């Protein structure tokens, strides 16, 4: 697990949607990695993040609604709980990502 303030970057040559860009990891908890793309507001209309667990990927709104993919009920429940705890931080991170600025690390689920 990373310490607060440290951003990990997914080094895959192309993202889940075939976009060739780095996708910073903004949080991680219970084996779930949370990522945000810079300038990703053009691909999905709603503010969102990408989640990965056990080789599966999904896209969630900042309120925890799954809009693409499926991570199963346990991971989805944990993500919804995390969104409720960290709503303001998610909004700040989304604004930074949409503007192409440094995306802050968001504390994991407690």
Can you annotate each of these PLM segments?
Residues 1-25, 108-110:
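Intrinsically disordered, low-complexity and often Lys/Arg-enriched segments
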Residues 15-45:
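Short, charged/polar N-terminal "headpieces" of proteins
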Residues 23-26, 57-59, 64, 68, ...:
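Generic secondary-structure boundary/loop-capping signal
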Residues 37-75:
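A short, structured beta-strand/loop element
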Residues 5-9, 23, 34, 55, ...:
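Intrinsic disorder/low-complexity segments
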Residues 78-110:
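C-terminal structural segments of small proteins and small subunits
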């Amino acid at each position: 697990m990373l310490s607060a303030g440290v951003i990990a970057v997914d080094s895959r040559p192309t993202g889940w949607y075939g976009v060739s860009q780095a996708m910073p990891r903004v949080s991680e908890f219970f084996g779930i990695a949370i990522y945000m793309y810079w300038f990703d507001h053009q691909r999905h209309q709603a503010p969102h993040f990408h989640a990965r667990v056990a080789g599966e990927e999904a896209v969630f709104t900042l309120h925890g609604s799954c809009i693409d993919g499926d991570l199963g009920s346990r991971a989805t429940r944990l993500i919804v709980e995390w969104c409720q705890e960290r709503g303001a931080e998610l909004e700040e991170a989304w604004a930074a990502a949409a503007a192409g600025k440094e995306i802050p690390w968001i504390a994991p689920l407690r």
